[in-house]
């Protein structure tokens, strides 16, 4: 697994041993970032269930302003990958339960232009992930939440003010894009 383009192009990322982490495939990541286009530039990024950090580090490599990477178990790998890409200065790594850290970020008044959520497939609680982001008002105005889930998992059409805007399937993965519903 590697960073596809940008300032850290070609940098190989370390993955944890075993099969507890399922990083987003390079091909899927490439398609995702092609769809996101220029919205990544200068974005404040939140990566929930960050694993290897591939999504946030790819965003930083492509010009995102900053990223918060959250995972319960891969803190050391996130730090190593941020250092490998020379993007550690823009990457804030938080170790802990994703829902608890999301609540902390909300209490701090933090908002993000782009939120990646990549929980384990068959985690069965994608609605909870979306509700945590919506309840904490973590998504900035005009922001986008990108949820990766298993292709066979049920799609959540809405959670709080977040509404499904579009979805795409890539092999065993489905990428769902959510934005805040327009008011008025």
Per-range role (PLM):
Residues 1-184:
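Class I S-adenosyl-L-methionine-dependent methyltransferase catalytic core
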